[in-house]
Regions:
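Short, solvent-exposed recognition patches
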Residues: 204-290, 303-307
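Acidic/charged, solvent-exposed loop-and-adjacent secondary-structure segments enriched in E/D, K/R, S/T
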Residues: 88-110
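N-terminal mature ectodomain segment of secretory-pathway/periplasmic proteins
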Residues: 20-92, 120-158, 162-168
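Bacterial N-terminal signal peptides that target proteins for export
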Residues: 1-7
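Surface-exposed amphipathic alpha-helical segments
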Residues: 162, 169, 173-192, 296-318
Length: 318
């Protein structure tokens, strides 16, 4: 009898592990579908008490993927993706600035390309079923293992694995940012003119021919003070335009979900330590360390960013 009970417990444990692995596979597929699934739809973006509406179309496969999102309210702007290239378009400079800000969070592609290390800092749990844009979806909650990060909730359509709704919540359970499809068809437009820009003023956010950031000889030799789980992905050093003697070191860290950029540049004037919200869940913190101005940008809570910028210790290579 005891052996039978023990066998039953073991089988239950194996089943639970298999179910957990299946859930992580769903999230991995959701990260791919969020960038590659052909679609035509409309979505809402809610943050900081404001609401924006965008129309999005996407078609093609692999390097030929094209995507265009157009604002339906607020400043007129377009964000167009062709393969790896990402460009903002607008009728005037003010609207172009708004387009650059909107491009910080390109729903439904909220998850990073590679989520291989995500389980170190987050747990995954199914939290029920829902219906979004007349489609069934399953809630997948990525809960941080500490209070320094946001909770990310995704409602994933079970056939395509496309996230139909994404909510970012703080430790108190309040929604910091929310994206929701109101209309969605899982096919792209047949007419290629749907991907053409309407406006002439543009700004290239990411060039298809841009060199990839790698760990180089000028990267900092040591960075401490990051929350657990963050690893250095890549680093680069650049000179400022027209100021060859002034260089900026840029490093990108990730915990498998959050992408965190660290900028180090020579300090030229006194700036107070501060943390500010840039856009939705994206915050920025700055502080002076010796002769350098240090800036952090990422989708972490403002208190976390401020604590990090205070505790960050950077040792530069000679």
């Amino acid at each position: 009898m005891r052996l039978t009970q023990l066998s039953g417990v073991c089988l239950m444990g194996v089943a639970m592990l298999a179910h957990a692995d299946d859930d992580w596979l769903v999230v991995k597929r959701a990260a791919v579908a969020a960038r590659q699934q052909p679609l035509t739809g409309t979505y809402l973006h809610q943050m900081n008490g404001s609401l924006e509406t965008f129309r999005i179309v996407r078609g093609g496969t692999g390097d030929t993927i094209q995507e265009k999102r157009t604002s339906l309210d607020g400043p007129s702007r377009e964000i167009i993706r062709k393969g790896l290239e990402l460009t903002c378009y607008a009728p005037d400079a003010k609207s172009l600035s708004a387009a650059k800000i909107s491009a910080m969070r390109l729903f439904p592609a909220i998850l990073p390309d590679d989520i291989g290390n995500i389980a170190q800092s987050y747990t995954l749990k199914r939290s029920g079923k829902d219906r979004v844009a007349q489609r069934d979806c399953n809630w997948m909650d990525l809960k941080p293992r500490d209070s320094k990060r946001y909770l990310l909730r995704l409602c994933v359509e079970p056939v395509s694995n496309l996230p139909l709704k994404v909510i970012t919540q703080n430790a108190a359970g309040d929604a910091v940012e929310q994206f929701t499809f109101t209309e969605i068809e899982l096919q792209g437009p047949k007419d290629k003119s749907a991907f053409r820009p309407q406006y002439k003023q543009n700004y290239v956010l990411r060039s298809a021919n841009a060199p990839q950031m790698t760990l180089d000889a000028d990267a900092p030799s040591e960075v401490s003070g990051m929350p657990s789980g963050f690893k250095l992905l890549r680093a680069v050093q650049r000179s400022l335009p027209g100021q060859a003697e002034r260089t900026i070191r840029h490093m990108v860290f990730s915990d498998g979900l959050v992408m965190l950029s660290l900028f180090i540049e020579p300090q030229t004037d006194g700036r107070a330590e501060r943390a500010v919200n840039l856009h939705g869940a994206v915050n920025m913190a700055t502080a002076v360390q010796g002769d350098y101005l240090v800036t952090l940008v990422g989708d972490l809570p403002e208190p976390t960013m401020l604590a990090m910028i205070r505790n960050l210790k950077i040792t530069l290579k000679p």
